[in-house]
């Protein structure tokens, strides 16, 4: 006679063994039930409860329910695929953010058109309302089962499992797959999905293994959520920085230099605007800007510990009998500057900053426009300080970071604090001081932050700053990392007030992280419609006829002299054609000059979006732009 306790404390008494589905039916939830959580363990609705237990019915409204839907849909994908392509071997199909994927080994290869066929077949299976049943077999029985089916990859997975294990499998129709589960009770629960794309993937993620084909999909608990997600993807595609970068002639990347950016003139203006703003931030907040070499002898990277941890992503070269690495980060070089001359405690905190160009040999499959590259510039800074100075420095940096993000239009910031891992260097006393300093600095700001216990680096705790863009996508940009290890490894010292040599703490800090990535985020956040102060071109001036050309040339000179970023279009084309063309470039202003404007020494001003501001003098227009522009006269 099991007594079932529900989340609200209600108790249900049953005369005999009862399934999760039967309990759900007694609650009027049988149609919504996808699975159950019995005493903290997720189980299928067919699971039998034999003794008293705590039970939560899992539905599509729960995060766990959504994950079960997605995992079950991955299996639906595998079933539908093998029905159409019997030679396709199944491998794995996990849940990922917003969806799932399944990897297949198929020598003929899938085409984009095949996804349409597979998706149609999946919908057919949904309509058939196939019951999804769990059963168990011994490891050896399961191994033989998949050997008989000729499923090479499933065999490989099972061979890695100890022989005494009992394995769970799920059956829907004629399709059987290895899985821990749980799954939804029937395919009818899997109505709201879409297959998204094909990609390549190595078996077990190892590039030395064979390449498989990965099919990505998304699945949701209801049709509306699916529509909202697909609409968001359309928004993302429309804002894709790669597309906008090409349309606005900002940058390109080519085959001969994968992961390295060719900045075009307008893109370089945008880059410089951001860099020069950050240079002012450095200057106004007590940082000394430095510059360090690109090539550094391998021996320094060995001393710093980077060779062991990052050697596989370093670009290297040999000259004579010496091995060099192109720097993947700037910190060891900054310590070399610090080490030039003995420092006193009176010199601390010492803040060094650099727009450091770094190279990392990232896998080609991870490269993505200017968001993920092999050559990037960091707004990198290192603060050399005492343990007692950590809190004040962290507090100042938090304010600085929030101000920078707000300046560029990002108001939603999440913060995560990662604390000591099991394997670490430094005494517990130093870790205590550092973590307390970070916690107190965060709490003093009265901001919400998330604790990630044990997620810090081996050399110190860290704070991560994650900004949200206009689509609520999260981007981890800023970091502040406490480091007890590297200054000691590289011999950084200072003389304390008692004339004793001590090792400083280093605070590694960056606000944007990679300038390239931050610019990609900006491009997508604004969809190429930058505020006037950030726009590479603030205005384009067009003539109605050829006789207005000289007047426009003089206006351009005058505007540029005042620090405005302007261009002219004097082509012998219709005004409407030129306005339409430049509107697509999303410049803040289009200025039109005809007979009336030339006679009065004015320009007719159209604001981005088509709003007509009427005619005004050149001086009035300059004042208007200067009022909007926070970075005027930076680039001329």
Swiss-Prot record:
Cofactor remark from the record: Binds 1 zinc ion per subunit.
Cofactor(s) recorded in Swiss-Prot or TrEMBL: Zn(2+)
Residues that bind Zn(2+): 331, 382, 508
Region (Catalytic): 240-531
Family matches, as Gene3D superfamilies: 3.10.20.30, 3.30.54.20, Anticodon-binding domain, Bira Bifunctional Protein, Domain 2, Threonyl-trna Synthetase, Chain A, domain 2
Compartments, record wording: Cytoplasm
Catalytic reaction(s) noted: tRNA(Thr) + L-threonine + ATP = L-threonyl-tRNA(Thr) + AMP + diphosphate + H(+)
GO cellular component labels: cytoplasm
UniProt KW keywords: Aminoacyl-tRNA synthetase, ATP-binding, Cytoplasm, Ligase, Metal-binding, Nucleotide-binding, Protein biosynthesis, RNA-binding, tRNA-binding, Zinc
Top-level enzyme category: ligase
Gene Ontology terms: biological process: threonyl-tRNA aminoacylation
InterPro entries: aa-tRNA-synt_IIb (IPR002314), aa-tRNA-synth_II (IPR006195), aa-tRNA-synth_II/BPL/LPL (IPR045864), Anticodon-bd (IPR004154), Anticodon-bd_dom_sf (IPR036621), Beta-grasp_dom_sf (IPR012675), TGS (IPR004095), TGS-like (IPR012676)
Domain TGS as annotated: residue spans: 1-59
Enzyme Commission identifier(s): 6.1.1.3
CDD domains: TGS_ThrRS, ThrRS_anticodon, ThrRS_core
Molecular-function GO term, any one: metal ion binding
Database matches in SMART domains: tRNA_SAD
Entry annotated with the keyword Cell inner membrane: no
Function per UniProt: Catalyzes the attachment of threonine to tRNA(Thr) in a two-step reaction: L-threonine is first activated by ATP to form Thr-AMP and then transferred to the acceptor end of tRNA(Thr). Also edits incorrectly charged L-seryl-tRNA(Thr).
Subunit structure: Homodimer.
Family under the similarity heading: Belongs to the class-II aminoacyl-tRNA synthetase family.
Protein name in UniProt: Threonine--tRNA ligase
Provenance organism: Vesicomyosocius okutanii subsp. Calyptogena okutanii (strain HA)
